[in-house]
């Protein structure tokens, strides 16, 4: 049957005879079955069962002579393989994973092009859905192109990056065209015409045994996927005896719905991602992309992604992951909180995600395509975290074996300042984790939350464990473990536990000595990782002080190094009050270790960093005026001078911590916002501009710059809270 459709051999892209109605009906069901099986396989991937997914789509079929169906025929199957390798590549950044993903996605692209060509060569005048013939293959092609472009960007090659832009442009144009078809199909006449066509096709196969067998298999597969338990065992159904005209018509309609689901959810996801990403990249890059046809709309992109979450398939799951990253990612970490938002209620301790308003807001969003603009009314959740929470709980049910969704649930709890609950969720045992990259991500996030809770012993142990399960950032993990050990050493000094203090000190010394030798083992885009640059400078400064004053390396550490890490990861905004109290009263009360045998006076640069961290901690404790005074009197005065009612950079002071001055200027802006709210917007902007213009490039400039950019977006109304 597949050979009759021109799908059964490599030469299947050659012209064949036009399809008759009976063959078109069989083709619809066969296509729909492949999509359903691909959906199930990709659900398995989302449930951390990639091996099962590969086994499902690479099984042999009767008459296939032992050859893999996935390798010879289905673009949808090849897309599944591409998705599996793509996830591995983007989570691990390993060269071999990137190469494998690129090859698999290239095969998926080629298969989609070949099968789209088959449809044209066969002269099919009847579409398998309400969209033009072969649209499902165009969507598969666009998905493969989009993932392939991202994979090429990871290859660290200029030539590959140029190829990636070309792929992105093709994917964008394809999705733009299909998006127009989808909007056109919403017209009542179109749907009615397609329904009549399907009804007439069913008459041609009312007694066809091959059709009956295909219908039975399709409906069992479809029911299996739609079963919320996501059990891989096929669900028994009444489809086994479906061989009447009525059942054929029903099956054809269901098959058409499956194909339409793939098309619509795929476009919502992929075009939504493109629209959103293009809208939030830096303006300079955005202008360059617009010249070559890329145009984005944040609201349009978000609305498409929210629409995609209505589908119970891989596209809906990935859309939810993107939304979780958008709302609880970098923009969520902004300290500039708008009044009346979810974040405002969270900060006040008045937010209950289970009772939050679940209504929607209506807006006119501009969907921007290569041929111009079109306006469309969309609804977005008034409280997106409430909606995401419900979807996330459903995803945990759909994918019970996956640590990926446990990770997302933990992150969501942490974003609401429920650190203990987040750690408890991530501590739950769900059995072995197949995706080691997800295991590493969850362990890292959980360990950072423990760090925010001042659990230094557990954190140190976990950072060392991360070295064993993650190929990246070994120098950074070693350094942070060392900073935890330094804090354990100081805690034991305060408690008078000499033996425990010595043990922690020895561990910290060993780790600080090892960390520099691990720098450069892994690079991103051929550059040393920013945190590696930071830790190299920090350890070098400790070594210089150690030699200069003839003291132990650990006693030259200065202000709590682990609290610098907490600050870089926006930990103060998530800490419970008791953790903040301890940090302020004990950890940030001094630099270095006054009780240590080899204590030296506090260095000027260490004192400045300590005062900056104290000020931020106090603001998050609600002691705004006290924090403002510490920041203004002890930090800002060394960075900024004022004359003629204008601020100027103080060039007379040399700063040994390059990240500190722009960070302090940013924090000054945040104090203005907390103290004066929207009334102080102009002053807030002034301080943000000072932070933004401090320097084009400095240590951790990307991390600090993201916070500054996020604050500007909030002020401009450019980010949904």
Curated annotation (Swiss-Prot):
Keyword Phosphoprotein: yes
Protein's UniProt keywords contain Manganese: no
Record keywords: Cytoplasm, Nucleus, Phosphoprotein
Entry GO CC: cytoplasm; nucleus
Domain of life assignment: Eukaryota
Chief location of this protein within or outside the cell: cytoplasm
Location within or outside the cell: Cytoplasm; Nucleus
Entry similarity comment: Belongs to the IML2 family.
Function: Inclusion body (IB) resident protein that interacts strongly with lipid droplet (LD) proteins. Involved in LD-mediated IB clearing after protein folding stress, probably by enabling access to the IBs of an LD-stored soluble sterol derivative that acts as a chaperone in inclusion clearing.
Subunit comment: Interacts with lipid droplet proteins.
Descriptive protein name: Inclusion body clearance protein IML2
Species classification: Eukaryota, Fungi, Dikarya, Ascomycota, Saccharomycotina
Gene, per the UniProt record: IML2
């Amino acid at each position: 049957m597949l050979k009759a459709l021109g799908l059964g051999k490599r030469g299947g892209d050659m012209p064949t005879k036009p399809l008759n109605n009976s063959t078109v009906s069989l083709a619809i069901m066969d296509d729909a079955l492949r999509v359903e099986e691909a959906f199930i396989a990709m659900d398995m991937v989302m449930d951390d069962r990639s091996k099962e997914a590969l086994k499902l789509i690479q099984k042999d079929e009767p008459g296939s002579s032992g050859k893999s169906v996935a390798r010879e025929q289905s673009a949808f199957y090849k897309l599944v393989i591409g998705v599996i390798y793509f996830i591995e590549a983007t989570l691990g950044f390993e060269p071999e994973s990137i190469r494998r993903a690129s090859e698999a996605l290239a095969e998926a692209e080629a298969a989609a092009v070949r099968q789209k060509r088959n449809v044209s060569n066969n002269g099919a005048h009847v579409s398998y859905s309400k969209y033009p013939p072969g649209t499902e293959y165009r969507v598969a092609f666009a998905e493969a192109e989009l993932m392939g472009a991202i994979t090429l960007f990871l290859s660290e090659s200029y030539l590959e990056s140029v190829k990636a832009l070309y792929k992105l442009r093709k994917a964008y144009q394809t999705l733009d065209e299909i998006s127009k078809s989808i909007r056109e199909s919403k017209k009542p006449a179109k749907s009615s015409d397609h329904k009549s066509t399907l009804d007439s096709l069913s008459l041609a196969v009312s007694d066809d045994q091959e059709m009956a067998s295909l219908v039975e298999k399709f409906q069992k597969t479809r029911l299996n996927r739609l079963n919320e338990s996501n059990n891989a065992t096929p669900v028994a159904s009444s489809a086994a005896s479906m061989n009447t005209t009525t059942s054929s018509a029903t099956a054809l309609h269901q098959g058409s719905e499956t194909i339409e689901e793939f098309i619509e959810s795929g476009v919502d996801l992929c075009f939504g991602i493109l629209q959103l990403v293009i809208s939030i990249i830096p303006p300079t890059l955005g202008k360059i992309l617009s010249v070559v046809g890329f145009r984005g709309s944040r609201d349009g992109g978000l609305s498409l992604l929210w629409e995609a979450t209505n589908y119970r398939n891989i596209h809906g799951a990935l859309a939810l992951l993107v939304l979780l990253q958008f709302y609880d990612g970098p923009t969520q970490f902004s300290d500039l909180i708008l009044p009346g938002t979810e974040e405002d209620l969270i900060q006040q301790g008045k937010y209950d995600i289970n009772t939050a308003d679940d209504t929607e807001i209506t807006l006119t969003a501009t969907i921007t395509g290569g041929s111009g603009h079109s306006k469309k009314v969309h609804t977005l959740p008034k409280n997106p975290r409430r909606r995401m929470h419900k979807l996330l709980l459903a995803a945990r049910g759909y994918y019970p074996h996956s640590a990926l969704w446990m990770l997302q649930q933990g992150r969501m709890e942490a974003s609401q300042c429920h650190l203990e609950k987040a750690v408890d969720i991530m501590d739950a045992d769900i059995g072995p984790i197949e995706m080691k990259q997800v295991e590493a991500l969850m362990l890292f996030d959980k360990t950072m939350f423990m760090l925010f809770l001042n659990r230094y012993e557990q954190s140190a142990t976990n950072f060392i464990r991360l070295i064993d399960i993650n190929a990246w950032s070994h120098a950074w993990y070693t350094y942070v473990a060392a900073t935890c050990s330094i804090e354990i050493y100081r805690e034991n000094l305060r408690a008078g536990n000499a033996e425990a203090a010595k043990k922690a000190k020895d561990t910290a010394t060993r780790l600080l000595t090892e960390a520099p030798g691990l720098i450069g083992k892994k690079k991103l885009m051929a550059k040393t990782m920013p945190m590696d640059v930071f830790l190299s400078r920090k350890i070098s400064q400790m070594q210089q002080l150690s030699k200069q004053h003839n003291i132990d390396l650990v006693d030259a550490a200065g202000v709590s190094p682990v609290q610098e890490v907490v600050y870089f990861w926006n930990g103060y905004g998530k800490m419970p009050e008791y953790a903040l109290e301890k940090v302020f009263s004990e950890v940030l009360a001094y630099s270095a270790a006054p009780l240590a045998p080899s204590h030296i006076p506090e260095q000027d640069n260490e004192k400045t960093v300590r005062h900056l961290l104290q000020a931020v901690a106090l603001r998050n404790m609600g002691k705004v005026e006290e924090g403002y005074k510490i920041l203004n009197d002890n930090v800002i005065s060394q960075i900024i001078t004022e004359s003629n009612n204008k601020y100027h950079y103080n060039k007379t002071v040399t700063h040994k911590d390059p990240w500190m001055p722009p960070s302090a200027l940013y924090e000054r802006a945040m104090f203005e916002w907390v103290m004066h709210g929207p009334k102080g917007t102009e002053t807030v902007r002034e301080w943000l501009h000072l932070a933004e213009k401090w320097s084009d490039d400095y240590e951790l400039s990307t991390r600090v710059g993201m916070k500054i950019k996020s604050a500007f977006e909030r002020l401009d109304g450019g980010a949904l809270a």
